[in-house]
Amino acid sequence: VLSVLGVLVIYGALSSLRLLQAAHHLERGETAITTVRAELTTADLTESKATPELHVAEAEFAEAHNEIHSSWLDPLHVVPYVGRQVDSLNALSGAAATVTQLGSTALSRVQSLLSAPHHTPAERAVVVRNLASVIDGLNSRVERISLGPSKALLPIIATKRNTFVTDLNKLRAGLNKGQAAADAIATLLDNDQRYLIFTANNAEMRDGSGMFLQAGTVTTDDGRLTLGGFHSTAELASPTPLTPISGDLAARWGALSPNADYRNLGLSPQFELNAPVAAAMWKAQTGQKVDGVLTVDVAALQDLLAVTGPVSAGGVTIDAADVQHYLFVTQYVGVTGNAATNETRRQELGLLAEGVFRAIQGGGVSLTHLASALDQAVDGRHILAWSADPTTEADWVTAGASGQLGPDDVLLGTINKGVNKLDPYQQVTARLRLSPHGEDTDVQISATMHNNTPPGLPPYTVGGATPASPVDYYTGALALDLPKSAGDVTERGGTGVVAIGADGPSNVL
């Protein structure tokens, strides 16, 4: 009996040692992954900077899995409760090793694709399509990963498993987003598309986007983007509706004629409601049918200029450092209500967008840095996209570029109605307070808006053209978009409610 007990003690000690070694490997692997996640940007991930840490994580997770998967521990699998813990550790370590190995392999393929020649539009279109294929393959394999048992686990193992589930879900969401973006862009570049494109100015805001001040078209052919020239939306405004509107858009915003003036389409932040109306308006005015609609604002141009470097527009060279000051201040110097000078000023935003497009088309732009800039612009609603094709629209939605608010999203925006360019100087602060009451929760959002307009701005910027909007006076509204599930919405402290009710997938106040 003592001999048997001795053997069991020795076996238990050696088994504990193997599990302890596995725990150390898992910890070192987690540290490497944390470094990758915390310190590296999208561009870093595709420029080999993540590769060393990923290899470290891959090796550590593989060692941990080898320790736990060892035949030495097989007897533990049949021990009640203990076997479940070992099974869970085995599955988690194997999943971690698989994910890092897949990620490392996929990154190597991405780096190989991006290092291949892509100087021409056609070559870049092929790269995008191949990137979509790589992400699709990685995504399908990640979806098949099993994490083992989830119940009756030790607290420390349950916590590790829950963390892994959270991280794996984030990875899957990121892969879905990346694949959808690559598919949508590849479709745009490959299939002779024509999109209506707006340039928006954040100096005069609508809810969740700048006012659409210039409109034009961009067509694609074998990867090449061709801009058809921009037109001032002020000049395109119609005295009568260009197309009928219905539903929430008509009920909330119909009185301001968004179907007659492109500048009022952004009153609703729901781009999937606005874009089809814009496409119908454009067809009514020009006879051109478009396959989709894009918007690009000043912040997006700044992100893109950081990649392309300086561009020339209207005889002026502009870079990422000065584009906001130029478009928010400098371009308005000397501008009056004179139609000729005003039209010249309005054209500058479109000319700048054309310059950026030319720089991207010309080659020599890092695709990794371009992808990072586009990702940043999309996350901030600075680039919005809609497609008339349901499959491509679904890709834009998954990529986060559709401007569609989710069922739990809250958006606080400003709507400028003061005939001025003072939005960059408005400081909006908000506080959220939650008060649970049984199954319900009272939500209070306190918002304050401070006008910090500095002295010395050009007269055209500060307004004063109408009695209702004196110089330096901000006339407009705060728009609060809430989940559809929010009920009993009330307000106090404002000067009145101009719109309340359903607005697409949200409620607006």
Map each language-model feature to its residues.
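Non-catalytic, solvent-exposed segments at the cell envelope interface
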Residues: 7, 11-509
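N-terminal Sec-pathway targeting helices
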Residues: 1-5
